[in-house]
A protein has these predicted regions:
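C-terminal motif of bacterial Sec signal peptides marking the signal peptidase cleavage site
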Residues: 24-25
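A short helix->beta-strand "capping" segment at the edge of beta-propeller domains
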Residues: 33-47
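WD40/WD-repeat beta-propeller blade N-cap
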Residues: 45-52, 88-94, 130-136, 172-178, ...
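Short coil/turn segments within WD40 beta-propeller repeats
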Residues: 50-53, 70-74, 92, 112-115, ...
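Residue-level detector of Asp-centered blade-edge/turn motifs that repeat once per structural unit
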Residues: 59-60, 101-102, 143-144, 185-186, ...
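Blade-level signature of beta-propeller repeat domains, shared across WD40, Kelch, NHL, RCC1
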Residues: 305-331
Length: 331
């Protein structure tokens, strides 16, 4: 009888342990919940006849600009998906688009060796910037709206006065073509990524190189500042995204696990998540503090070339080689 009671007590203890483990396992962890997100297809925007190479949200989040290999830029209503304007003027592929901070203008660069500044409301060309035979591969507007930066095939970065189109400064330091450029949120610094596999952070006013960030093993395709300006994300043909400390140049995280080349990275407004575009026909969301966290959303039928978060962080736009733009809802 005593042995039976002892055995029953053991069973009771074991059951209590199991129930306790189940309770702990099912309990919600607020910190974990904060890191969870979901991405759902909202709408597909059709209007381009060739690959969509670049997408960019207007500062108020109401419009979207897309640049395509059909030589055009399209302005979309982000809420309805309606085509508002088709900007025609480039003679060859459009490879990069960006909005001015006040939302009045869109800048685009093309394989036709021109940069065009457009009136976003009327669709008219405001001015055309040229550098002879020097092609510009990426454009980025300064936060104050006064300057436009362009990375070029001549291994340098040109800074234009956006108000009159005058070239005011050239930044030299890369040993190969500059594929991507991005201004820091405070406008003091510029980041550039090159075919030479390096990222350079520049002091724009002084025109000097502050840091050279080495770590990628192939051509850089995209650089993007965190909203607070403390970190920089870069994506490359080596299929990796690297997070850098923008002050020291130290690597703080390497986000791997992508199957193919990384073409575009975009930081969410919360500073915790990155959107990534790769050779795969999908959009990838990454937690910048957890390299194991990967979420994928499928919707495109061709390589995803560009991703861009809306200013409020609730939507994401992607452009791809299936000639479409997709808007995603993100929670």
């Amino acid at each position: 009888m005593q042995e039976k009671n002892t055995e029953m007590n053991r069973i009771k203890v074991l059951m209590l342990v199991i129930f306790a483990a189940l309770f702990v396992g099912c309990e919600n962890n607020p910190e974990d919940e904060d890191e969870l997100f979901s991405i759902k297809h909202a709408k597909t925007l059709e209007g381009h006849t060739e690959w969509v190479y670049s997408v960019s949200w207007s500062p108020d989040g109401k419009k979207l600009a897309s640049g395509s290999w059909d030589n055009t830029v399209i302005i979309w209503d982000a809420n309805t998906g309606a085509k508002l304007k088709t900007l025609e003027g480039h003679r060859w592929y459009v490879i990069s688009v960006c909005w001015s901070p006040d939302g009045k203008y869109v800048a685009s660069c093309s394989e036709d060796k021109t940069v065009i500044i457009w009136d976003a409301n009327t669709g008219e060309q405001v001015r055309t910037l040229e550098r002879g035979d020097n092609r510009v591969l990426s454009v980025s507007w300064s936060p104050d709206g006064n300057y436009l930066a362009g990375g070029s095939v001549e291994n340098d970065i040109v800074i234009w006065d956006a108000n009159n189109g005058q070239e005011i400064k050239t930044l030299e330091g890369h040993s190969d073509r500059v594929i991507t450029v991005s201004w820091s949120p405070d406008g003091r610094y510029l980041a550039s990524g090159s075919k030479d596999k390096n990222v350079i952070i520049w002091d724009v006013n002084a025109g000097t190189e502050l840091l050279t960030l080495e770590g990628h093993t192939n051509t850089l395709n995209s650089v993007c500042w965190s909203p607070d300006g403390k970190h920089l994300a870069s994506g490359a043909y080596d299929a990796n995204v690297i997070i850098w400390d923008a002050k020291t140049g130290a690597k703080t995280q390497i986000l791997d696990g992508h199957n193919f080349s990384v073409y575009s990275v975009s930081w969410n407004a919360d500073g915790k998540h990155l959107a990534v575009a790769t050779t795969d026909p999908e959009v990838i969301l990454r937690d910048v503090n957890n390299r194991e966290s990967i979420q994928k959303a499928k919707g495109h039928f061709g390589t995803t070339r560009s991703v861009s978060w809306s200013p409020d962080g609730k939507k994401l736009a992607s452009g791809a080689c299936d000639n479409t733009v997709i808007i995603w809802n993100v929670k």
